[in-house]
Amino acid sequence: DSSTSRGLGDVYKRQDMKKKVFDFADEYRRFISLCKTERECVEEGVRILKAAGYKDLKDVIAADEKLKAGDKVYAVNMNKAIVAFNIGETSIESGMNILGAHIDSPRLDIKQNPLYEETGLVLLDTHYYGGIKKYQWVATPLALHGVVALKDGTTVKVVIGEDIDDTVVGISDLLIHLASEQMDKKAAKVVEGEALDILVGSMPLKQESAKSDKEDCKDAVKKNILALLKEKYGIEEEDFMSAELEAVPAGPARDYGIDRSMIIGYGHDDRVCAYPSLIALVNADMPKRTGVCILVDKEEIGSVGATGMQSRFFENMVAEVMDRCGEYSELKLRRALANSYMLSSDVSAAYDPNYASVFEKKNAAYFGKGMVFNKYTGARGKSGSNDASAEFVGKLRKVMDDADVAFQTAELGKVDIGGGGTIAYILANLDMNVIDSGIAVQNMHAPYEVISKADLYETLKGYEAFLQM
């Protein structure tokens, strides 16, 4: 059994706890049903922050306003990452309490020149994003989400496949009757990356006249798809070149289990940590130390690029806030980062009785036992991990126990079985105390993942307690 401050199911034994657990789960389920891309998460995050009285840091700078304890600001990076600050009583130089999560999830990205017709069928070519089992993405309804940037400077939002009456798309699979060779392949090769092409149409464009020459018949189905896209979104085929379109599982997240104790949906990794991180910050009164929530992109492919955690965005925004507070210098910025505490809010693998052989039971995460702390992640001898200091873990234990938060500690499977990484090491490189902390997930990186509602609620409580450290 993993170590925990309360036993399995105790979350529900306290008075009125089930209602609180289920009410917050309903809020979260709506969030992940609406927000299936990093851009959509940022857009909804801005709405939540504005409603809570947060100002855009860009506007504060433009107006040459000063910031003080009690002020609340946010900043957006290229519409794909966001950071928010709840300025506390002590100087930022003395350190911040930071909640950091990622809002990108494994998916299929549409290529820049994707559309083609083959034997009367029109397909979109894709390039998968992040670590996926490719065979899981066939024969399942998919939706298209994203943006198309036009040459005139405008950006068109695209969502196809989410409304109950809307159409969906998908990737075909080979029928079992003809699959003898396919069934002999290793799982990694059963469906290959270049075979993940999405079927989007089969009806030719209706011709204005009765012309019958071959030129009119060529790519008639593709022409029909382009005509429909032009009619609804005003986009041409060449506009795919400057588009960011993502194929994701269609439809809303759902309650899971006969007792409704779980949620199944796309993108729990890592929006199940991102949402309570943001809500914990919004719920907080003025803290002693400045509270921060940063939600970033590109974690699933190494946290690279301008919107990933490895960019200078976070440091730059801390510098801007310190400047508005009248306390900026390069040395003070470095001190602020080194004196900070961070929870790298990312998911952990939930123990699964169907695959018990890959888990070491004493150090596994379990549904219903609260938020998960991973002192270290990595693989094959902790390679690539952030290993949190014992002293920092000791402080967090007291904070969680004082706030009556159910928590557990875990590793990602047995030694040498596998492993994984998060954004933790990137912030730790700035010399701050960082630990991975999040929620146990089954089916991680599958189109539909599963989490426990009790763990979600305890994690919200844990994040709220952390911000008051």
Predicted regions mapped to residue ranges:
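N-terminal hydrophobic/helix-forming segments and targeting peptides
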Residues: 10-469
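Single conserved hydrophobic/aromatic residue that forms the stacking wall/gate
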Residues: 1-12
